[in-house]
């Protein structure tokens, strides 16, 4: 079951790193979707043509049970043929254009 309502809400409340990366990804010749629902999950960004999902990870992804939850989620997505790229939020803040270029290069492989 897709979580469209959650995706809509997340589009309205994107974090600063997500906004910065979206500004870069929306200007490339590949189509990216932001806050895209896939089954029970919502990907920060998704390139359907390349089947690549992008997650911008803040510090919370390193704490408590979150790393395990991320592994389970990534495994579920991989089983459906979606490659997952996890990008630290601090890297996006440092250079959103460099991060976007790396993602685009991966999508073109």
Where are these regions (language model features)?
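Basic, amphipathic alpha-helical patches used to engage nucleic acids or provide basic targeting signals
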Residues: 10-14, 38-107
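Solvent-exposed, charged helical/coil patches
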Residues: 1-33, 79, 101, 109
């Amino acid at each position: 079951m897709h979580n469209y309502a959650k995706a809509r809400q997340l589009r309205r409340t994107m974090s600063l790193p997500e906004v910065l990366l979206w500004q870069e990804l929306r200007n490339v010749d590949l189509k990216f979707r932001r806050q895209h629902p896939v089954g029970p999950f919502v990907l920060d960004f998704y390139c359907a043509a390349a089947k690549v999902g992008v997650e911008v990870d803040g510090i919370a992804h390193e704490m408590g049970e979150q790393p395990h939850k991320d592994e389970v989620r990534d495994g579920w997505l991989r089983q459906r043929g979606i490659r997952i790229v996890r990008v630290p939020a601090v890297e996006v803040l440092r250079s959103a254009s460099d991060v976007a270029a790396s993602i685009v290069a991966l999508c073109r492989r």
